[in-house]
Regions:
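N-terminal core-binding DNA-recognition domain of tyrosine site-specific recombinases/integrases
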Residues: 2-4, 14-82, 86-88, 104, ...
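Conserved hydrophobic/aromatic pocket- or pore-lining residues that grip, position, or stack substrates
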Residues: 37, 52, 76, 97, ...
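Active-site/catalytic core of tyrosine-dependent DNA strand-transfer enzymes
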Residues: 197-246
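C-terminal catalytic core of tyrosine-transesterase DNA break-rejoin enzymes
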Residues: 67, 85, 134, 138-145, ...
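DNA/chromatin major-groove-contacting recognition/catalytic segments
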Residues: 118-121, 173-177, 285, 289-308
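Conserved tyrosine-mediated DNA breakage-rejoining catalytic core shared by Y-recombinases
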Residues: 149-208
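Short functional hotspots where side chains directly engage DNA or cofactors
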Residues: 160-163, 219, 260, 272-290, ...
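Basic, Lys/Arg- and aromatic-enriched nucleic-acid-binding interface segment
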Residues: 66, 70, 85, 89-91, ...
Length: 308
């Protein structure tokens, strides 16, 4: 076996991998590679489990989330697997442990009163960017998806919105050159490409506009150029401040939509499909947390079915 270090293998892996993934995915891989993997393991020709485990614990202790660390390991494993296929390094099967979370952080959602206040204000003070917030609150779309929404994605025959593109700014590395660029891409997964029915209120708001807009234009800008997510986040943040509403991340609107669906008794599979989750377990883990009363009703319902 002709042993090579991780830096050499990573260079070869990059040339190979870029042909099979989206540019945005490759950009995310390279960011993790250059920021975390190469500084730690670039010169290594062996990666025993204890070294990787120590790396994981140091990163988490340093304030990096377990999710990000897991993403780093996914990239590292891809590189090692590629190197092993080429006979440059042993193929390792690490059993990495992560510190137990002391307390699962609750999702930040908008209160019902604030939710109604935002909708009422935006309906009374119409702008195209404001319409994007209304659509997000009615559909749970991601910020990149709402930035990528075009008028032609709104079907007045089916009364549905078709999610089929996303806008994102990616980090690009080309040799010594490092820069960012805005890209319009397909959504993050196959499940993210989806049809979302419009509510009666949203339909009434959009219907008159559809007679006069250019179907190839982006909804938020009403032009052929999209608004980028960072700019739209700033608009949203300023809107909340203007209305005196506590700061909430834009993604909190998606959480709010999903939470209100679950609280209203919508079935979990339908909510999962509306959100574009890859599988229903993501929806269940994020949004379904039965309280004591719900658990009691469940048991009572089961016993009632048995005639008890």
């Amino acid at each position: 076996m002709e042993t090579k270090n991780i830096r050499y293998i990573a260079d070869a892996w990059k040339e190979y991998k870029q042909h099979f993934v989206k540019q945005s995915s490759m950009a995310a891989y390279l960011l993790l590679l250059n920021k975390h993997i190469l500084p730690e393991f670039g010169n290594c020709t062996e990666l025993p489990e204890h070294e990787v485990q120590s790396f994981v614990l140091r990163k988490i202790k340093g304030g990096i989330s377990a999710k990000t660390v897991k993403d780093i390991l996914i990239v590292l494993k891809m590189i090692v697997h590629y190197g092993a296929k080429n006979g440059w390094i042993n193929n390792y099967s690490w059993d990495i442990k992560y510190p137990a979370n002391e307390q699962k952080k609750e999702l930040d959602v908008m209160s019902t009163d604030n939710f109604k206040q935002v909708l009422a204000y935006l309906q009374k003070n119409f702008t195209f960017q404001g319409l994007g917030i209304i659509i997000t609150m009615n559909t749970g779309m991601r910020i990149g998806e709402i930035c990528g929404l075009q008028w032609g994605d709104i079907d007045m025959d089916t009364n549905c919105i078709s999610v089929q593109r996303t806008v994102e700014r990616i980090y690009v590395m080309e040799g010594d050159k490092k820069y960012t660029k805005l890209v319009v891409n397909t959504p993050k997964t196959q499940n993210s490409c989806r049809q979302i029915p419009m509510s009666k209120d949203l339909l009434a708001l959009v219907k008159p506009l559809m007679k006069v807009v250019n179907k190839s234009y982006y909804v938020l800008s009403n032009s052929d150029k999209p608004i980028e997510p960072r700019t739209y986040r700033n608009y949203y943040k300023d809107l909340l401040a203007q209305l005196g509403i506590p700061d909430l991340k834009f993604h909190g609107l998606r959480h709010s939509f999903a939470t209100k669906c679950i609280e209203a008794g919508c079935d979990y599979k339908t909510v999962s499909v509306l959100l574009g989750h890859a599988n229903i377990s993501t929806t269940l883990n994020l949004y379904v947390h039965p309280n004591a009363d719900q658990k009691k009703r469940c048991i009572d319902k089961m016993l009632k079915s048995l005639g008890k």
